Amino acid sequence: MNVEDIIEKVANGEIKLHQVEKYVNGDKRLATEIRRKALERKLGISLKHIGHYSIDPNELIGRNIENMIGVVQIPMGVAGPLKINGEYAKGEFYIPLATTEGALVASVNRGCSALTEAGGVVTTILDDKMTRAPLIRCPNARRAREVAEWVKENLNYLQEKAVAKVTRHGKLRDVKPFIVGNNLYLRFEFETGDAMGMNMVTIASEEIMKVIEEEFPDVRYLALSGNLCVDKKPNAVNFILGRGKTVVAEAIVPREIVEKKLKTTPELIAEVNYFKNLVGSAQAGSYGFNAHFGNIVGAIFLATGQDEAQITEGSHGITIAEVTPEGDLYISITMPSLEIGTVGGGTRVPTQREALSIMGVAGGGDPPGVNAKKFAEIVAGAVLAGELSLLAAIAAKHLARAHKMLGR
């Protein structure tokens, strides 16, 4: 069967999209082209831009994508340099931002300029863990409590018996049990090195469930995720307990810089932040007590191959702005749930790996975990730059003007 015959059979449904590879001896690049051409024929459209790319489907299909037909290209800009005085990120960094929102890169760039001129951003990682919360059905609440207590007392045993069997980098460090009636939710916390770690902790949690069922034959493991993890959904537990990296970025911006570069005052920025980000968000019932964490997190995630659905939790957090006794501006952002990695998943895609290399965080660190922490500090610094610039634009009544100029 020649290529033209395969395209026709895919277009009319005789060959399913996921079956194409076996008709072309596993040539994934050719299979990608066939699927795209079959779709063009069936729908009567042109997909020439989707079909124009440099990355190799043979490296992606089966690892990052199924039924591949091409790529979506998102414009990528760079903001910076941003000076960061972190525990892992030390120096000046450029921030890759993939977005179609005009004015976003310019705004973050302005924030980077102001913060760097002010001496830079201080970043602090408060916590680092990835969680998974399996659901166990128990005969009653007392049995659920007994199981929870046993698990808390046997973390080292579970690490050796279960976790170490399936991962070299994952380490079970804690568990927080939640009991609802006769249902037990075990929110396991793991260290995952430079990986974001969801696959790692999912596989490890399943091994732990096998051990628990052996130890307690009268309980039943029902779901590997009981939704108390919590992954890819707005939620309070991550906001309070954290998931991924919990990180703070802060800076003091002298009044002169606020007035000359940002065209406003520390007092106005503090007032806008309080009544917009704190009071307004409280009235809305939002977990985003901030101006636009999600804008910067989303643009960096798309550029660097992070799990884009976890932009949800990355948008959670609090911005604080206040006038110091000296009359300058103190500004900080706190991100409780920044779920990122520098190895695995989409970070293997060549374009995304190149974006990570712009910040000097591509691949694993030595020791494991330091690259992901460095990356977290850079992201937090960029988010602070974005918050500072947008709050200043709102305070100066420049927001609409900027979008008229750059956002059409």
UniProtKB/Swiss-Prot annotation:
The active site is at E101, D307, H403. Keywords: Isoprene biosynthesis, NADP, Oxidoreductase. It catalyses: (R)-mevalonate + 2 NADP(+) + CoA = (3S)-3-hydroxy-3-methylglutaryl-CoA + 2 NADPH + 2 H(+). The keyword Oxidoreductase applies. It is an enzyme of class 1 (oxidoreductase). It comes from the Archaea. Its EC number is 1.1.1.34. Pathway: Metabolic intermediate biosynthesis; (R)-mevalonate biosynthesis; (R)-mevalonate from acetyl-CoA: step 3/3. GO terms for biological process: coenzyme A metabolic process; isoprenoid biosynthetic process; sterol biosynthetic process. GO terms for molecular function: hydroxymethylglutaryl-CoA reductase (NADPH) activity. InterPro entries: HMG_CoA_Rdtase, HMG_CoA_Rdtase_cat_sf, HMG_CoA_Rdtase_CS, HMG_CoA_Rdtase_eu_arc, HMG_CoA_Rdtase_N, HMG_CoA_Rdtase_NAD(P)-bd_sf, HMG_CoA_Rdtase_sub-bd_dom_sf. CDD domains: HMG-CoA_reductase_classI. Belongs to the HMG-CoA reductase family. Converts HMG-CoA to mevalonate. This is 3-hydroxy-3-methylglutaryl-coenzyme A reductase. It comes from Pyrococcus abyssi (strain GE5 / Orsay).
